[in-house]
């Protein structure tokens, strides 16, 4: 149900009143919408950065005379168009990512949120996250984003070591990072997430753990740990290939991850996903939608989405990718109302593979009820109950299959990639042997 314009403008005020509310249950995750429901999350991509970090191969550009008013107008148009095409009536969360969305004007954020609230129901307590870098996130700017409707921040600290920050090509220092973190916590208490990278060239376990322990003395209730991935085409990849830097040691990275998980658990953090840790119920409801294979709309250059185009008469979930280059994307939005470059219908098996691979990233795993929303006939017991490989994984203490569903143990989360090889193979085998059904796809 669309909101009248006056109600849309009042959304920010209502959101600020509701943002202190937090679910008391810290053992599960946010409720997952049915796969073909009229609910979705919304991702908004801001494509610009001050500079390209040495490790990054994301779709981002260094701004040269950006017409933000034109970009803002196109973000608004595309959000409204995709909401109409998808038939989505309720937006559960909004995430402004990039790029560096903290470089955007708060007016752009407000305009997108107002457009969403006009086209669909955006609850006052919806999670609205903005990614921020310390050098573009002064206290006054953060306050302005809060006034625009943002109620959660994700700060890309990456490291608290100045030498490592220089290696990564970051524009901030460790001191900048800590100052931004303190200001963010003052403005968004209990709703600030921080990223910390591990597995850098020449990085050692002890110094990295001391960084993490230092961060825990001043951080909020959400921490993400990301292992460096050397991506072809990045400066860091070239430096390692040419021998200017040592290749990251995967065994050391695995040790950092294991030790880091233990430190976070000791500090009261729940590892609710492979890379994400929260305490006091501070899970990211937006990212939870991804892991539970809920629908999400991707707005902006290069954004990805997964939804059923019900508003256009569709019945099959599609993977959608928007045009990468900002100028080309804006031209398409002005011509067609959206800049979708590629639409790939997902088969029933492809969707189930995503449900399995994404769901097992979480500590909750895949409940029987959740699986049946996507596949009512072939149960988790049918798939894995008699599997020799699954029994072996259970005996090793890595996997659990019981009355709740299928999930990794705490030890299993650390080696999920190796577990998925057996599980996906078993799913594919069982799918080929099944009796075809007429169950509609979600």
Curated annotation (Swiss-Prot):
Signal peptide segment: none
SUPFAM superfamilies, sorted: Radical SAM enzymes
Annotated region described as Disordered, given as residue ranges: 1-37
Main location as per UniProt: mitochondrion
SMART domains per the UniProt record, alphabetical: Elp3
Record: residues binding S-adenosyl-L-methionine 2: 99-100, 158, 170, 195
Source organism superkingdom: Eukaryota
Cofactor requirements of the protein: [4Fe-4S] cluster
Transit peptide range per the UniProt entry: 1-22
UniProt keywords, alphabetically: 4Fe-4S, Chaperone, Heme, Iron, Iron-sulfur, Metal-binding, Mitochondrion, S-adenosyl-L-methionine, Transit peptide
One BP annotation, GO: porphyrin-containing compound biosynthetic process
Residue ranges annotated for the Radical SAM core domain, each copy included: 34-270
Record's function text: May be a heme chaperone, appears to bind heme. Homologous bacterial proteins do not have oxygen-independent coproporphyrinogen-III oxidase activity. Binds 1 [4Fe-4S] cluster. The cluster is coordinated with 3 cysteines and an exchangeable S-adenosyl-L-methionine.
Name of the protein described by the UniProt record: Radical S-adenosyl methionine domain-containing protein 1, mitochondrial
Species of the source: Bos taurus (Bovine)
């Amino acid at each position: 149900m669309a909101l009248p314009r006056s109600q849309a403008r009042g959304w920010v005020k209502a959101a600020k009143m509701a943002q202190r509310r937090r679910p008391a249950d810290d053992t599960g995750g946010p409720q997952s919408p049915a796969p073909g429901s009229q609910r979705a999350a919304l991702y908004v991509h801001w494509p610009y950065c001050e500079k390209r970090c040495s490790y990054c191969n994301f779709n981002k550009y260094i701004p040269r005379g950006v017409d933000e008013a034109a970009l803002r107008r196109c973000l608004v148009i595309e959000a409204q168009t995709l909401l109409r095409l998808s038939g989505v009536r309720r937006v559960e969360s909004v995430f402004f990512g990039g790029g560096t969305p903290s470089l955007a004007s708060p007016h752009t954020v407000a305009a997108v949120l107002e457009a969403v609230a006009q086209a669909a129901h955006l609850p006052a307590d919806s999670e609205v996250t903005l990614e921020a870098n310390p050098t573009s996130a002064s206290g006054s700017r953060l306050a302005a984003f809060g006034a625009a409707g943002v109620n959660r921040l994700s700060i890309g600290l990456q490291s608290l070591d100045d030498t490592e920050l220089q290696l990564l090509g970051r524009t901030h220092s460790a001191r900048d990072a800590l100052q931004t973190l303190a200001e963010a916590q003052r403005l968004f208490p209990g709703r600030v997430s921080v990223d910390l990278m591990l597995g850098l060239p020449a990085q050692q376990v002890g110094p990295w753990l001391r960084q993490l322990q230092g961060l825990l003395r001043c951080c909020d209730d959400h921490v993400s740990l990301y292992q460096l991935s050397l991506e072809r085409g990045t400066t860091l990849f070239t430096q390692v290939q040419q021998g200017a830097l040592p290749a990251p040691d995967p065994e050391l990275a695995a040790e950092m991850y294991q030790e880091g998980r233990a430190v976070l658990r000791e500090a009261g953090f729940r590892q609710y996903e492979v890379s994400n840790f929260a305490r006091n119920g501070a899970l990211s409801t937006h990212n939870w939608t991804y892991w539970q294979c809920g629908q999400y709309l991707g707005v902006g250059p290069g954004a990805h989405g997964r939804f059923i185009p019900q508003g256009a008469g569709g019945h099959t979930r599609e993977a959608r990718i928007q045009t990468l280059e900002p100028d080309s994307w804006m031209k398409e939005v002005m011509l067609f109302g959206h800049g979708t470059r590629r639409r790939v219908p997902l088969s029933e098996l492809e969707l189930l593979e995503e449900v399995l691979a994404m769901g097992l990233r979480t500590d909750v795993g895949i409940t029987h009820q959740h699986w049946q929303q996507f596949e009512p006939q072939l149960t988790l017991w049918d798939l894995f109950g008699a599997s020799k490989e699954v029994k072996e994984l259970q005996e090793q203490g890595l996997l659990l299959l019981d009355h709740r569903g299928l999930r990794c143990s705490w030890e299993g989360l650390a080696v999920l990639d190796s577990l998925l090889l057996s599980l996906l193979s078993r799913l594919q085998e069982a799918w080929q042997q099944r009796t075809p059904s007429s169950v509609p796809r979600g």
